[in-house]
């Protein structure tokens, strides 16, 4: 078990700060339904949240042996960004939870920076994050590659093993673990299937929470364990 001190808290954005994954999924499924059977699309994409839209397109093209129209990618991404920017709600309790934790905070997301900034504003976390926003368009490879998490740690001058991550997706958990960081799995967003906690546990998360009210105590417990406090 990693017992080095925790010096930086890094949060995913979609599905952790804001309840956006279900909105993006709706847009993508509606857009792809003209090109493949919807029921089969839903089965294929079940549990793929956390992937970039481009990775989802590649998955669909491979599975159905089709080539999607080049303009569809940008159209659906724009639709999803607009819907999220105007309609997304913060995850219940996230602002209160993050403001009660006395650690520097960053966000590391598979979305584009302008989209992450919009979601941060919707969650009223601009001041708490203090500009520490890291996104897929800032790195060579998106999650599940560790690039965006490593960039956050490097920029803030914290060793990866001293970072604690909050993630909702298997994709994000794999990225954070590949970066050498500890992970708290969050299963409280509206898109999360009932068995998802088991999936995240099997990947190796350090702890699981189902509501943001649990986050401060969970972080405190992990910090105490690292310092020999329990």
Which stretches of residues belong to each language-model region?
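Helix-loop "lid/cap" segments that line or gate small-molecule binding pockets
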Residues: 29-32, 52-67, 119, 153, ...
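Short helix-capping segments at alpha-helix termini
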Residues: 34-38, 64-67, 124-128, 157-158
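Conserved phosphate-coupling serine/threonine residues in phosphotransfer and NTP-handling enzymes
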Residues: 16, 109-111
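Active-site neighborhood of HAD-like aspartate-dependent phosphohydrolases
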Residues: 1-44, 63
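A short, Lys/Arg-enriched amphipathic alpha-helix followed by its capping loop at the start of a domain
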Residues: 31-35, 93-103
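Metal-dependent phosphoesterase signature
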Residues: 38, 58-96
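Asp-based, Mg2+/Mn2+-dependent phosphohydrolase catalytic module
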Residues: 2-7, 99, 103, 112-230
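A short, glycine- and basic residue-enriched loop/turn
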Residues: 21, 42, 88-91, 123, ...
